[in-house]
Amino acid sequence: MKPVIALIGRPNVGKSTLFNQITKSRDALVADFAGLTRDRKYGDATYQNKSFIVVDTGGIGESEGGIDNYMAEQSKTAINEADIIIFVVDARAGLLASDEQIARELRTLGKKIYLVANKVDGVHAEAALVEFYKLGMGEPLQVAASHGRGVQQMLEDVLQDIPEDENPEEHDKDTGLRLAIIGRPNVGKSTLVNRLLGEDRVVAFDQPGTTRDSIYIPFEREGRKYTLIDTAGVRRKGKVDEMIEKFSIVKTLQAMKDAHVVVVVVDAREGIVEQDLHLIGYALEAGRAMVIAINKWDNMSEYDRKQCKLDVERRFDFIPWARIHLISALHGTGVGELYPSIHRAYESANLKVSPAKLTQILNDATDQHQPPTVQGRRIKMRYAHMGGQNPPTIVIHGNKVDKTPADYRRYLENVFRKVYKLEGTPVKIEFKTSENPFEGRKSQVDERTAARRRRYIQKFKKAEKKFKR
């Protein structure tokens, strides 16, 4: 098991920046706003052949109510999961009462704790750090996370008792099925994640935009590995005023590309809006397998349910291959039925077929319904092979195949879907026109052959003149 290291501290001391330095990524949103990081965030990291998991937490704030109090509960959960705790303080701001309160709570846990003083750049370090000795946690490790200064030395100290990996490849194994939960703000994404996980893992708070980061959560179900990605709620670009929300949109789009399957959550009570369709469009551009979850289905009248179903059939007619589920994430109704559709979409997206079988299906399809003619000549499709997975990509070679019209492309897509029972994934078909490999090449002959050719030509011309007489 990889050891877990939790970054703990009050808001805006630089935990997310330190997280990025440790994991060598921009996984945690970084901006100069207190309370920006609202959930536990997991990241894999390796330093000097030592693999571990880093958990970035929301700051333990001084507010007693609302979301700040909920953030504190999330941080405490992360502390319980951790093997090692890095307690981050702000060298510029100095020792605050909230730092002392956190230190008192941490000392009661019996875990290995390292005190890290961040933002030591631009201050007299020795003078600034004296007061932190009052916390009784020994000498603070000095870092300037925004510049990466002191981070390597900190890791050497923190990881000194962690053994090196016996087999580094073991830590690079597949994370399992990566599942991204996407949707507009406040449609119930975090509630669905909590229901899927069976624990109160991400902040599910009645406030649009509560989840600002994409959170990667590894878990197992019935012996199968998953990584659940809870994405930030995506607003229309016109309504994105805060820099934080712009960051979150980027994170959502990145999470789509990182996922194997995307679950698009739609609010049944608000109906399908343009932003829902835009999100599906983004997922299609990323070529991701997809399952639609119509949430908040409970407590709707029979008339509203009927109208919702009609709206779904009408607005989602461009993705007839996507499974649609009517669920209530809050009460768990229909949530368990998502898994079979997710698995089917994943299997379809990772289709692998030999070129011989694909070519046979292509030949059967063209025999049954011939390709159209282009400039008086019929398109000739010769053979097909797989060009990739997720999405399944089929490459067709032949003469003038790049001129294939859209309706015949759809016909071929439907044939492949029917034969291999592909559900929940877009199918990409690429056409490559066969080229004459000798086109543009000049014949290269030796001098002897060239001389013989000239003699034959002269002899032919003499015979032709003699015949004309």
Swiss-Prot record:
The record's CDD domains line, in alphabetical order, gives:
EngA1, EngA2
Q: Which family is this protein grouped under?
A: Belongs to the TRAFAC class TrmE-Era-EngA-EngB-Septin-like GTPase superfamily. EngA (Der) GTPase family.
Q: Which residues bind GTP 1?
A: 9-16, 56-60, 118-121
Where does the KH-like domain lie? 351-435
Give every EngA-type G domain span. Answer: 3-166, 177-350
What is this protein identified as? GTPase Der
Q: Which GO terms describe its biological process?
A: ribosome biogenesis
**Annotated Gene Ontology MF terms?**
GTP binding; ribosome binding
This chain is encoded by the gene named: der
Q: Does the keyword Transcription apply?
A: no
Starting at the broadest rank, the lineage of the source organism is: Bacteria, Pseudomonadati, Pseudomonadota, Gammaproteobacteria, Moraxellales
User: NCBIfam families per the record?
Assistant: GTPase_EngA, small_GTP
Give UniProt keywords alphabetically: GTP-binding, Nucleotide-binding, Repeat, Ribosome biogenesis
Q: What does this protein do?
A: GTPase that plays an essential role in the late steps of ribosome biogenesis.
Q: How does it assemble?
A: Associates with the 50S ribosomal subunit.
